[in-house]
């Protein structure tokens, strides 16, 4: 018998709600020692077309078609039978059994939401069985790096009902010595931004990810407001706090005309690149995600060749946490960073594989939430486990976002003097 062995004795799933009030899957795995682990999967709004399939019921009379009873039943009636009896400490095997059972490239038979819920719950159960925090179980003795938070404080695009094309305007408090100080600085900027927007007559209600969603004259105006908020909080833009953007460009790309619609103008990929470069030259922008359409490999490669030595270019919809697409990006030098979302690929093992491939090719990895989140803080442990250096988990409001920040505070506290906050050194894929 293997030295570390704790058998899965039951797997149960149920339908619960995410932060948007839509159903999602929660799974609970019980081991032979009586230990349990549970996990809830998130759900995205601006989804890449190459993502693994999130199985929804499609019954318009039940949660407006968004029910997940099919996925829940797949866990309870199909997956459980196959994973009961497996060793919970063999995560790769647990995941492989589920992937083989599904048998499709994009998990369309069982649903990525069904497989991932069990995958995450099994990892939690195994960690609990050993009495280890999840980040130590997943990452081992060297898990010690706290991430630079990329805080989405102004929302646009698919995440808000306003007129901004760019989906996320984020702050990155990279010029600090600890996660705790970085988080505080971010919160102070968030509150100052609220005061400034309020004073100038803007609505300060928040979007899906907890950021503000004002109607502004242009995307650049959002950056200007953030710069003012950083200064009002007593910090220096470009020294302590930097700016990041997620364009989510596939959302404003017209496949027929091959043009991008930004600030009311139709632009080619080359014109859009020049637009981004003009912003990068003007403001302390350190990271830019999904600047082009998810099929525009050429646009990415040309842009990364131009500015990849000074900006982190992150592929999200481009890669969908998929090693095959990531390998293509590596071959084409498409980006110098990848966004990591567990539910884009649908298992813990495949997520770790994507991170490993990125690291081997000197790319950074940004671990990310989805716009439809829950109280589950798995990604906070994951980002420390793999020493990723960056996390995207929303703004400084809404419990579904704060749950991750609070878990990171706990982890930093627990690691004590061994905790590392790399700050600007986390940007290793940008040629210094």
UniProtKB/Swiss-Prot annotation:
InterPro entries per UniProt: Enolase, Enolase-like_C_sf, Enolase-like_N, Enolase_C, Enolase_CS, Enolase_N
Record family assignment: Belongs to the enolase family.
Pfam families tied to this protein: Enolase_C, Enolase_N
Molecular function, one GO term: phosphopyruvate hydratase activity
Cofactor(s) listed: Mg(2+)
Enzymatic class: lyase
Residues the record lists as binding Mg(2+): 246, 289, 316
Compartments in which it is found: Cytoplasm; Secreted; Cell surface
GO biological process, one term: glycolytic process
Binding site for (2R)-2-phosphoglycerate: 167, 341, 370-371, 392
SMART domains: Enolase_C, Enolase_N
Protein name per the record: Enolase
The EC number(s) this enzyme carries: 4.2.1.11
Biochemical pathway: Carbohydrate degradation; glycolysis; pyruvate from D-glyceraldehyde 3-phosphate: step 4/5
GO cellular component: cell surface; extracellular region; phosphopyruvate hydratase complex
Superkingdom as given in the UniProt entry: Bacteria
Gene that encodes it: eno
Record-linked Gene3D superfamilies: Enolase-like C-terminal domain, Enolase-like, N-terminal domain
């Amino acid at each position: 018998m293997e030295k570390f062995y704790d058998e899965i004795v039951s797997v149960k799933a149920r339908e619960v709600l995410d932060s948007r009030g839509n159903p999602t899957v929660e799974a609970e795995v019980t081991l032979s020692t009586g230990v349990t682990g549970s996990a809830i999967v998130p759900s995205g709004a601006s989804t890449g077309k190459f993502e693994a399939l999130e199985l929804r019921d499609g019954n318009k009379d039940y949660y407006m078609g968004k029910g997940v009873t099919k996925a829940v039943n797949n866990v309870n009636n199909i997956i459980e039978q196959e994973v009961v009896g497996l060793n919970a400490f063999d995560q790769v095997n647990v995941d492989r059994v589920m992937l083989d059972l599904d048998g499709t490239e994009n998990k369309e038979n069982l649903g990525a939401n069904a497989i991932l819920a069990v995958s995450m719950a099994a990892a939690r159960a195994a960690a609990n069985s050993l009495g280890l925090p999840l980040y130590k179980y997943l990452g081992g003795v060297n898990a010690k790096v706290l991430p630079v938070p990329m805080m989405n404080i102004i929302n646009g695009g698919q995440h808000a009902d306003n007129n901004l094309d760019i989906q996320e305007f984020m702050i990155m408090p990279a010029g600090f010595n600890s996660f705790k100080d970085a988080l505080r600085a971010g919160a102070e900027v968030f509150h100052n931004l609220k005061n400034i927007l309020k004073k100038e007559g803007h609505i300060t209600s928040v979007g899906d990810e907890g950021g503000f969603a004002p109607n502004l004259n242009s995307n650049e105006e959002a950056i200007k407001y953030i710069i003012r908020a950083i200064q009002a909080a007593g910090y220096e833009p470009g020294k302590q706090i930097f700016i990041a953007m997620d364009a989510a460009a596939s959302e404003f790309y017209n496949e027929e005309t091959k043009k991008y619609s930004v600030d009311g103008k139709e632009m080619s990929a080359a014109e859009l690149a020049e637009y981004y470069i003009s912003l990068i030259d003007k403001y302390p922008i350190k990271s830019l995600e999904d600047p082009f359409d998810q099929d525009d490999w050429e646009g990415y490669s040309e842009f990364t060749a131009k500015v990849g030595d000074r900006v982190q270019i992150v592929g999200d919809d481009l890669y969908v946490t998929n090693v095959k697409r990531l390998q293509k990006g590596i071959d084409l030098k498409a980006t110098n960073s990848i966004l990591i979302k567990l539910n884009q690929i649908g298992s813990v093992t495949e997520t770790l594989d994507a991170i490993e491939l990125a690291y081997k090719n000197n790319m950074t990895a940004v671990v990310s939430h989805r716009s439809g989140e829950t109280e589950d803080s798995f990604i906070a442990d994951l980002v420390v486990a793999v020493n990723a250096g960056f996390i995207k988990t929303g703004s400084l409001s809404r419990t579904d976002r704060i749950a991750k920040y609070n878990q990171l505070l706990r982890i930093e506290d627990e690691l004590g003097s061994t905790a590392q906050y790399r700050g600007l050194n986390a940007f290793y894929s940008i040629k210094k």
